[in-house]
Every structure is written in C-alpha cells, then in structure tokens.
Amino acid sequence: MHPPGFRNFLLLVSSLLFIGLSAAPQSFLPSLRSLSGAPCRLSRAESERRCRAPGQPPGSALCHDRGRCECGVCICHVTEPGTYFGPLCECHEWICETYDGKTCAGHGNCDCGKCKCDVGWSGEACQYPTKCDLTKKISNQMCKNSQDVICSNAGTCHCGRCKCDNSDGHGLIYGKFCECDDRECIDDETEEVCGGHGKCYCGNCYCEAGWHGDKCEFQCDITPWESKRRCTSPDGKVCSNRGTCVCGECSCHDVDPTGDWGDIHGDTCECDERDCRAVYDRYSDDFCSGHGQCNCGRCDCRAGWYGKKCEHPRNCPLSAEESTKKCQGSSDLPCSGRGRCECGRCTCYPPGDSRVYGKTCECDDRRCEDLDGVVCGGHGMCSCGRCVCEKGWFGKLCQHLRKCNMTEEQSRSLCESADGTLCSGKGSCHCGKCICSGEEWYISGEFCDCDDRDCDKHDGLICTGNGICSCGNCECWDGWNGNACEIWLGTEYP
C-alpha cells in the first residue's frame, strides 16, 4: 500500500501528461505521414499552407487542384500528353517552343513551358542571337524559303533567322521560314479553326471522320465505313493509292491541264494512262507509241504492231527483247529514256534538237546548261552532257573560279548554313561557295542542303528527263509541265 504522497505524485504526473498530449502538435498524430511513410512532423494547417500558392487563403485549392498534398509536398497528377509539374503543380504546358527541330533551339532550358535562354540568345525559342556577325546579304540569303522569298513575306529576317509577324499575339504564323499560316484554317462564318471539326497543321485542315472541305465545313451523309467501301478499288486499296477519298468519292491526284480528266482516272482512280506511255514516247500526245489505243492503262495495238506499249513492228527481224536490248546500250532504259526505239534503232527526241544525240541517245547537252540557258557557265564547253572547263575554272557547270582573294575565315563564313555547319556537312568550301560531294550526286543547293532524290520521278527518271532538279523541285524545260515535268504542253512533234 502506497503512502498518500505517492498517490498525489502519480495524479500530478498523469495530469501533466494529459495536458502535454492535448497541447502536442498534430504532426505527432498518425493521420499525417511523410513521403517516406514516417509520421509527418507538420501540423495539417502547416502542411496545407505549404501546398497552397502564395497569398491564397486557408481552404483554397491545394497543389492547384492538380495533385495531392502529402506533408507539405505536392504529388502532381499524371495527365495527357505529359505531367503537371513544379513545386505546386503549377506547370501544365510542359512543351517549350522549338526551332529547327530543337527545343529552345538548343540555346536554353525549358522551364514551365517557357524557354529560359542562355546568355547571348533571345526569342520565344531562344532562336535569335543578341549579337550578329553576319552581313545583311548573307543573313537574308539564309532566311529565304525554297522559292527564294525572304521569310515567305510573312516575317522579318534577324541574323539569318525569321521572326514571323504575329502582332495579334495568337502565333498563327510559324515555321523556320514563316511558311505556315494557320489563319488559313479559320472558318470565315464560325471563326472556328477547321470549323471545329478538324485540326490545323501548317495552314491545312485535317478533318475528323465524317467531315470534309477545305475548312471541314461539310458533313458527309454516309458513315466513314461506307465512304471507305465506296472508295476501295478492286485491289483493296483506297483510291488505288492514287487519290483521296472524300465522302465516298475519289479525288484522283492527277489533273489534266486542259481541264479534262488526267492520266489517272476512274471511280476509284484505278486507271493510270501513264502505263500506256513508253519512256521513249513521252514527246507525243499519242499513247501506246502511237500504234494503239489505251484503255485504263492497257494498250490495244493496231495491226502490224505488238508489245506491252505497241512499240514493236511485226515486220522487224528482231524480237521485241532483242530490239529493246540493242536500244538500251549501257542504260537501263531504251534510248536512255530520250528517244523512240524501233527495231533496235533509236530516234532521239525531241526531233531537230541537236543537243540530244548518240547511238542510244546517251548524250544530253541540255545538262550543261544552267536555268538561264548558259552553257557551262560561259567558262567551258559541253561534251556529251558534261562540261570541260577552261583553265582556272571548275565545277559541274564550270561555275567556280579556282583563284580566291578571300581569307579562309571570310570564305567559311559564307559557307555556313543556318545551324552553323559548313556546307551542311556534305561538301567543302571554296572561296565562299560550297562544292558539294561528288560521291553523292544527289546533293545540291547553295549550302549542299538539298537532296535531288526528293524530286518527283516518272518512268524511273528524275524530272522525267525533261528538266533539272533544283533543291527538291523540278525545273522543267520549255514545253513541259507537271511535278515531274511529265506533261507535254508544247506543239506535237511530227
């Protein structure tokens, strides 16, 4: 039995312990825990205060309503296409501006959807150097689009980089050369982008299923499945891979310059009349070598002629295979794709043009001419389609002077492309001009930045042999038209 004094001592200790627990902060309560799972040492009020934006009163949204608060730390929700982030989940725009395929142009860091530029760079994508060492001429040259227009007439050039005109603040004009104008996608009546039924990319609307039109303004009265069924050709391809299906009807890619149907036609674009054109018969409006009729891409030959394209006379002592082989020579195409083969003999086209000659029409002196018609730059002579340059000149068209009065530094500054690479890494620099690699015949352009393989082909020939490839686009010779210079618009040859 304990004395009364001991009992009083126990009562005093119990009272003090009760008071202490009552006054203890809620951080010791098991309801709040830290990220490690240990009890949180913050009160609930303090934890929530740390998860609110500065200046927000108690009871307002925690973590901007984009996450949960755990012991004063915001755990942000995962969203599409990325995640909310930031100390208070305040950042949603996680993608920063890009320039030439690089985030913040490679000259800054992406912070909460905005570029923080390195010293010496500015702009929404850190694409503009604050100090420019380029001359105005070089700067403007670097700002020209493929049509040689500075910033597509939709912006201004700053040190070789385009700054697009977006005074309205909507940013609808963009692109490396300000070539994209999304204002073209806005419906004039509703003022909605693509009528609210599609997405805009570089000034073109891509409509949702069931809608069509330049601005997705027309609704299709049949289901997408039925539309696709009507457009499917017998070989199971939508519009035979030669057109676009719009509400159950095929719009074939080929357009005849006269306004009638073009070489590609049919309900599902299944007919390609180009299959009736022999590579050595491109210079006439007649199909099937002029000796038959073309029916949906197949030749029906007249009497006395045979072959896939009615190219072989029946009275020829040679077989069709022997005739074609004699006309090919070292080329993969009969008459090098520049003439007509009949019974093993080539007739070069166009008739009367002395620039195309040879037993198999292998020589084409038009290749020695520049776009202005000057032969070998005026500094050489043409021999079977190749320039033989005068002393002191070199290059494919004798366009480069061997003697140079520039310093190496001056020369290099003129050869650097927009990203600072010398001749795009595909050539060497001589006197301020890029000499593109001879091993890669398809590399061209002022800065060796063009790939001539991108030019359209027909019959296996770049620009159909009726023009030259200039930075990915065909520049057709007189009388020819079309993306691949495959359409003859001149007078018929006899």
Curated annotation (Swiss-Prot):
VI repeats lie at residues 276-326. Disulfide bonds join C40-C71, C51-C69, C63-C74, C76-C89, C91-C112, C96-C110, C104-C115, C117-C126, C132-C159, C143-C157, C151-C162, C164-C178, C180-C202, C185-C200, C194-C205, C207-C216, C220-C247, C231-C245, C239-C250, C252-C269, C271-C296, C276-C294, C288-C299, C301-C310, C316-C343, C327-C341, C335-C346, C348-C361, C363-C384, C368-C382, C376-C387, C389-C398, C404-C431, C415-C429, C423-C434, C436-C448, C450-C471, C455-C469, C463-C474, C476-C485. Residues 1-23 form the signal peptide. IX repeats lie at residues 415-454. It comes from Mus musculus. Pfam families: EGF_2, EGF_integrin. IV repeats lie at residues 185-230. Its main location: secreted. Coiled coil: none annotated. This is Integrin beta-like protein 1. Residues 51-494 are annotated as: Cysteine-rich tandem repeats. Residues 40-90, 91-127, 132-179, 180-217, 220-270, 271-311, 316-362, 363-399, 404-449, 450-486 form the I-EGF domain. VII repeats lie at residues 327-367. II repeats lie at residues 96-142. X repeats lie at residues 455-494.
